[in-house]
C-alpha cells in the first residue's frame, strides 16, 4: 500500500486524486492533506479519509477547522511550516503536489529534500525554478511523476526509448473557447465566456490560462525541464478534440502518441500507481465514435501568451518566474473584472519588458523574483484603462 500526502486536496486535482484513492483503498492510504480556503470541503475530506495530519494555508483558519472537526482525531497545522509538515509527514511515500501558484514551491522542495517521490501537478515548481528542482531531484534521488495530461502523455510515449532518439516533443492544446472567435470580438470577451472550456473541467485560474493558452506556454517550460529538451524541440499543435494528449517524434520518422478520453483521473492514477495501472472509471475511448482528429498551428496573434512563454523560456534565468507572477496577477484582475481579456497578455508583456533577467541561485531568490513580478504587475495593472466585461 502506498502512503500519500496531498497538497491542495480541495482543488480540482486534489479532489480527483481522492476519488482515485477512494476507489482503491487496498492500494493507497492518505497520511496528510492540505487545503486553502475551502474549509468545509477539507473537513469532509478529513472525516472521510482520516489523515494523521492536515494543514491549512493560513494558520488563522485552524480554529474554524477544529470546530468543523469536532470529535475527529487529527493533528492540525498551518502556514508554510504546516504545509512542509504535511509534505514530509512520517511514512509518506509520495506527495501529490497540487497547490496552485508559488505557494507550492517550498513544501514541494521539502518533500524532495526528505527523499519523497512527487506526483507533480503544480506548474509553477518547474516554470519558476526548474533548474533548482531538477538539481534537487537528482541530488536526493527521488522520482518526479507528471500529473498534467500532456506531460503524462509524453512520459508514457518515451517509455523504453533513448532520449537521444527524440527529435521533437509535440504538446497538444484544445485551443480553448476562443479558437475560432474573430479577433475583433476578443475585446468584448466576458468572464463567463472565458470560463466556458469546451473539453475539460478545471479550476477558474487554469481555465483562464487555457483560454489564453498561457497554460500551454507553462507546459512548454515544464517539458523543457521534465524531459531535458531545448525549446526548439518542443512544439504546440492545436487539437480541438483533446483525444491525443501529446506526441513524441523520433529520429526514424515515427511518432508515438497517447490517446484517451479527456479526464484528469487517468494521468493522476498513472502517477500514483506507476509502473502499474489501476482502474479509474474513465470511459474507454471508442475510436469508431470519432468523426476525426484535426491539428493546426497556434496563431500567436490570437494567443500572444504562448509567445510570451516561449520568450520567457528563451531569456531564461528569472524571466519565467516574473512572467508567471504577472500572469497570476493578470488572471486575478480579469476574474475580478478590473481588466479586459486582451489586457491579460498586455499586462504580462509590460511586466516582462520592465524586468532584467538574472540568475536565481535559491528558492528564496525565486520567491523574491515572484514578489517583484507581482508587485510590478499590480502597479502596471493600476495604470491600465479598465475594460470591465462581466
UniProtKB/Swiss-Prot annotation:
Taxonomic source organism: Trichlorobacter lovleyi (strain ATCC BAA-1151 / DSM 17278 / SZ) (Geobacter lovleyi)
PANTHER family with a match to the protein in the record: 1-DEOXY-D-XYLULOSE 5-PHOSPHATE REDUCTOISOMERASE (PTHR30525), 1-DEOXY-D-XYLULOSE 5-PHOSPHATE REDUCTOISOMERASE, CHLOROPLASTIC (PTHR30525:SF0)
Gene3D superfamilies reported for this sequence: 1.10.1740.10, NAD(P)-binding Rossmann-like Domain
InterPro entries in the cross-refs: DXP_reductoisomerase, DXP_reductoisomerase_C, DXP_reductoisomerase_N, DXPR_C, DXPR_C_sf, NAD(P)-bd_dom_sf
Positions bound to Mn(2+): 148, 150, 219
EC number(s) per entry: 1.1.1.267
Family under the similarity heading: Belongs to the DXR family.
Reactions that this protein is recorded to catalyse: 2-C-methyl-D-erythritol 4-phosphate + NADP(+) = 1-deoxy-D-xylulose 5-phosphate + NADPH + H(+)
GO molecular function: 1-deoxy-D-xylulose-5-phosphate reductoisomerase activity; manganese ion binding; NADPH binding
Pathway it works in: Isoprenoid biosynthesis; isopentenyl diphosphate biosynthesis via DXP pathway; isopentenyl diphosphate from 1-deoxy-D-xylulose 5-phosphate: step 1/6
Pfam families, alphabetized: DXP_redisom_C (PF08436), DXP_reductoisom (PF02670), DXPR_C (PF13288)
Any GO BP annotation: isopentenyl diphosphate biosynthetic process, methylerythritol 4-phosphate pathway involved in terpenoid biosynthetic process
Cofactor(s) annotated in UniProt: Mg(2+); Mn(2+)
Record-listed 1-deoxy-D-xylulose 5-phosphate binding positions: 123, 149-150, 174, 197, 210, 215-216, 219
Keyword terms of this UniProt record: Isoprene biosynthesis, Manganese, Metal-binding, NADP, Oxidoreductase
Binding site for NADPH: 10-13, 36-38, 122, 124, 203
Disulfide bond sites: none
Record carries keyword Transcription: no
NCBIfam families xrefs: Dxr, PRK12464.1
Protein encoded by which gene: dxr
Name of this protein: 1-deoxy-D-xylulose 5-phosphate reductoisomerase
Highest taxon in the source lineage: Bacteria
Function: Catalyzes the NADPH-dependent rearrangement and reduction of 1-deoxy-D-xylulose-5-phosphate (DXP) to 2-C-methyl-D-erythritol 4-phosphate (MEP).
Amino acid at each position: 500500500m502506498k502512503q500519500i500526502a496531498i497538497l491542495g486536496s480541495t482543488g480540482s486535482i486534489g479532489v480527483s486524486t481522492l476519488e482515485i484513492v477512494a476507489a482503491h483503498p487496498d492500494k493507497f492510504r492518505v497520511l496528510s492533506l492540505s487545503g486553502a480556503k475551502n474549509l468545509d470541503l477539507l473537513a469532509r475530506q478529513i472525516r472521510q479519509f482520516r489523515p494523521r495530519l492536515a494543514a491549512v494555508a493560513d494558520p488563522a483558519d485552524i480554529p474554524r477547522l477544529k470546530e468543523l472537526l469536532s470529535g475527529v482525531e487529527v493533528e492540525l497545522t498551518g502556514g508554510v511550516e504546516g504545509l512542509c509538515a504535511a509534505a514530509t509527514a512520517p511514512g509518506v511515500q509520495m506527495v501529490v503536489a497540487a497547490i496552485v501558484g508559488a505557494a507550492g514551491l517550498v513544501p514541494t522542495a521539502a518533500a524532495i529534500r526528505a527523499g519523497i517521490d512527487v506526483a507533480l501537478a503544480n506548474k509553477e515548481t518547474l516554470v519558476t525554478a526548474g533548474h533548482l528542482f531538477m538539481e534537487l531531484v537528482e541530488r536526493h534521488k527521488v522520482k518526479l511523476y507528471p500529473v498534467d495530461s500532456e506531460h503524462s502523455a509524453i512520459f508514457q510515449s518515451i517509455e523504453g526509448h533513448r532520449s537521444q532518439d527524440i527529435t521533437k516533443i509535440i504538446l497538444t492544446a484544445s485551443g480553448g473557447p476562443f479558437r475560432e472567435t474573430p479577433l475583433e470580438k476578443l475585446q468584448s470577451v466576458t468572464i463567463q465566456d472565458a470560463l466556458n472550456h469546451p473539453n475539460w473541467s478545471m479550476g477558474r485560474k487554469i481555465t483562464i490560462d487555457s483560454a489564453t493558452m498561457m497554460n500551454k506556454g507553462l507546459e512548454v517550460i515544464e517539458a523543457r525541464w521534465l524531459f531535458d529538451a531545448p525549446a526548439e524541440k518542443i512544439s504546440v499543435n492545436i487539437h480541438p478534440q483533446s483525444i491525443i494528449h501529446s506526441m513524441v517524434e523520433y529520429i526514424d520518422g515515427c511518432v508515438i502518441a497517447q490517446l484517451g478520453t479527456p479526464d484528469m483521473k487517468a494521468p493522476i492514477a498513472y502517477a500514483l500507481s506507476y509502473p502499474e495501472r489501476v482502474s479509474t472509471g474513465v470511459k474507454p475511448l471508442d475510436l469508431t465514435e470519432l468523426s476525426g482528429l484535426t491539428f493546426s498551428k497556434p496563431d500567436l496573434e490570437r494567443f500572444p501568451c504562448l509567445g510570451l512563454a516561449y520568450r520567457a523560456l528563451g531569456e531564461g534565468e528569472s524571466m519565467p518566474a516574473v512572467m508567471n507572477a504577472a500572469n497570476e496577477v493578470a488572471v486575478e484582475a480579469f476574474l475580478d473584472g478590473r481588466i479586459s481579456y486582451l489586457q491579460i497578455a498586455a499586462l504580462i508583456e509590460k511586466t516582462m519588458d520592465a524586468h532584467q533577467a538574472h540568475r536565481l541561485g535559491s528558492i528564496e531568490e525565486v520567491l523574491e523574483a515572484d514578489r517583484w513580478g507581482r508587485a510590478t504587475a499590480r502597479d502596471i495593472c493600476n495604470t491600465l484603462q479598465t475594460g470591465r466585461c462581466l
